[in-house]
Curated annotation (Swiss-Prot):
GO terms for cellular component: nucleus. 3'-5' RNA exonuclease that trims the 3' end of oligo(U) and oligo(A) tracts of the pre-U6 small nuclear RNA (snRNA) molecule, leading to the formation of a mature U6 snRNA 3' end-terminated with a 2',3'-cyclic phosphate. Participates in the U6 snRNA 3' end processing that prevents U6 snRNA degradation. In addition also removes uridines from the 3' end of U6atac snRNA and possibly the vault RNA VTRNA1-1. It comes from Danio rerio (Zebrafish). This is U6 snRNA phosphodiesterase 1. Keywords: Hydrolase, Lyase, Nuclease, Nucleus, Phosphoprotein. It is an enzyme of class 4 (lyase). Its EC number is 4.6.1.-. Pfam families: HVSL.
Length: 276
C-alpha cells in the first residue's frame, strides 16, 4: 500500500505541472481504478494461499461460555434426586461438615437396616459418604470461595479437637420435601458442635448466606430415599431399625466420630481445617 501511495503522488505531481485540471482528474480516476483493481487482485491472491483455521478446542470454548447458560436437572442421572436450587455456571454448592470414617461393625449393622427397610417396601439408598453437617448447603460464587474459606480458617485458629458419639436413629427431610433421610443423632459432644456451628454462621453472615438451623439436631446421615417418606418410615420400621442397633453382638452400637478436622466442600473441591 505504501508503494501504491508513492506512485500516485509522483503521477499527480507531473500531471499538475503540464496538464489542465480536467485531464488531471481523468488521470486520477484511471489511476484510482487501476490501484483498486490491483488491490483486489492482491487480496484474491493472498486469500487463495490462506491456510484453513483449526477449530478451537472444547476446553477453550468452555472458558468463554456464558456463565448464565441454562442447565436442565436430570434427576434420573443421580437416583431421582432434585437440586434445591437451579444450577448456574459459576455457582458452587457448598457446605461445612465433619467426615465420618465408618468401621466394619457400622457397615454390617447398616446393611441389615437397609434390608429391613426394603422388606417394608421402603428402598433406602446408602449415603455415598458419611458426614455430620455444620451448615446448610448454600451457593457460593466462584470468586467468593477463597475469602470464604479464609474466613472460616481464621475463625478456627484456637478451636480444640474433640469427639462426639451418635446412637439414636432419627428421620429427617429436606426443606423442599423432595428427600427423606435416615440419620443417627449425636448424643455426646453437642455443646462443641453448637459452638462450631455459630462460628460457621458468622462467616455465612459475611456473605449474606443462610445460617444453620436455630435448634439443630446434629446427626450422621446414613441413607436416603426420594420424596417425603418421613411418617411412613417412622411408623413402618424405625423401631425395628433401632432394634438392630441395640441388638449388636458387642452391645448397642455407638458411632464415634473424631472431630479433629473440619471440612468445607464447594463444588468438587474440599478444604480441610485441622483443629488444635
Amino acid at each position: 500500500m505504501i508503494v501504491n501511495y508513492s506512485s500516485s503522488s509522483s503521477e499527480e505531481e507531473s500531471g499538475s505541472s503540464s496538464s489542465p485540471s480536467g485531464k488531471r482528474q481523468k488521470l486520477d480516476t484511471e489511476t484510482s481504478e487501476a490501484l483498486d483493481h490491483g488491490s483486489a487482485q492482491r487480496k484474491v491472491c493472498k486469500s487463495s494461499h490462506l491456510t484453513p483455521r483449526l477449530p478451537l478446542p472444547e476446553s477453550v470454548k468452555e472458558m468463554f461460555r456464558d456463565s448464565e447458560e441454562l442447565w436442565t436437572d436430570k434427576s434420573e442421572e443421580h437416583g431421582g434426586r432434585l437440586r434445591s436450587f437451579q444450577h448456574e455456571r459459576g455457582n458452587w454448592a457448598t457446605y461445612v461438615f465433619f467426615p465420618y470414617d465408618p468401621e466394619e461393625a457400622f457397615l454390617e449393622v447398616l446393611n441389615k437396616m437397609m434390608a429391613a427397610a426394603e422388606a417394608h417396601d421402603i428402598p433406602l439408598t446408602v449415603s455415598e459418604e458419611f458426614h455430620l453437617s455444620l451448615s446448610k448447603t448454600v451457593v457460593l460464587r466462584h470468586h467468593w470461595i477463597q475469602p470464604f474459606v479464609q474466613s472460616i480458617r481464621t475463625s478456627l485458629t484456637h478451636f480444640q479437637k474433640f469427639y462426639c458419639v451418635a446412637y439414636k436413629l432419627k428421620v429427617y427431610s429436606n426443606a423442599e420435601k423432595t428427600r427423606t433421610f435416615l440419620g443417627m443423632e449425636v448424643s455426646t459432644g453437642t455443646p462443641h458442635l453448637l459452638e462450631l456451628s455459630k462460628i460457621v454462621d458468622e462467616t455465612m453472615k459475611e456473605f449474606n448466606l443462610s445460617t444453620f438451623y436455630e435448634d439443630p439436631s446434629f446427626h450422621i446421615s446414613l441413607a436416603w430415599c426420594v420424596g417425603d417418606q418421613t411418617e411412613r418410615l417412622k411408623k413402618a420400621c424405625l423401631l425395628e431399625l433401632q432394634g438392630l442397633i441395640d441388638a449388636h453382638e458387642d452391645g448397642p452400637f455407638h458411632a464415634r466420630l473424631n472431630c479433629n478436622e473440619l471440612r468445607c466442600k464447594t463444588g468438587n473441591k474440599v478444604f480441610v481445617f485441622p483443629l488444635q
